[in-house]
Swiss-Prot record:
GO process annotations (BP): glucose metabolic process; glycolytic process
Site (Activates thiol group during catalysis): H176
Organism lineage string: Bacteria, Thermotogati, Deinococcota, Deinococci, Thermales
Residues where NAD(+) binds: R10, I11, D31, K75, T117, N180, N311
Protein name in the entry: Glyceraldehyde-3-phosphate dehydrogenase
Gene that specifies this protein: gap
Species of origin: Thermus aquaticus
Amino acid sequence: MKVGINGFGRIGRQVFRILHSRGVEVALINDLTDNKTLAHLLKYDSIYHRFPGEVAYDDQYLYVDGKAIRATAVKDPKEIPWAEAGVGVVIESTGVFTDADKAKAHLEGGAKKVIITAPAKGEDITIVMGVNHEAYDPSRHHIISNASCTTNSLAPVMKVLEEAFGVEKALMTTVHSYTNDQRLLDLPHKDLRRARAAAINIIPTTTGAAKATALVLPSLKGRFDGMALRVPTATGSISDITALLKREVTAEEVNAALKAAAEGPLKGILAYTEDEIVLQDIVMDPHSSIVDAKLTKALGNMVKVFAWYDNEWGYANRVADLVELVLRKGV
């Protein structure tokens, strides 16, 4: 079963890099941009640097390490020739078709499963790898959301806190690199703060990541919320979680639980470090969440935990993991 990508932007390209490195065949890429530009942006990346292979193109194909990948520019998802290309799993990474009613058009085009690389509406299931991936049922789940990068950073930490100590309620702030949903210079935007120049401001804004965590950890429903501060960095973010627990704890107890999870059931998803790191140290880190143990604080039953994440590369790795899970379980 082959994979297709709709939307070859920041996430689509990084997911492609990872799938290519894992030997997963991407048979078709659909994007409204011309092939010359798609090939150039795959070959050269301001954050992740040169693609580790050969990239070429013509009017109909991209060529990666000599392998031809069909490239189309179709606006209507149901008209994309997924079936013709042998694509069973579509990665929907345009950011446009996040409503299941729109995303299911890929199924009409011949795909069997759609993985949305964003929080979705009306999806069959939201999956955060390492947290609730075992709930995936190929007979029932066809439109799948991989949640957001921030939900993927929060959920593993909250899972540990909830299971080890119990969470009464919690708030979070993600200090998050700017994204395409901001303005380079002051320009109109429906969010007046996001309308301001991204590269010179700290921009308070909303995030649904905390509430969305309850989709994969239902016990937290109504007890976890938060906000975002967008900052002038190109990738890399850090979640600041403050939780009231069901018993008093020490920072050492909390760190021990997080470290045990990182070395055990959440290995590869959650990382743990006692090094005094900064943002550039976690760029291109494949984990969903990297606990910065020296920043953990406890006061009675209140605890503060900081977790870094590369909001592009870490998230793209989880999309790739989810693709492999779907392929492994069958469509």
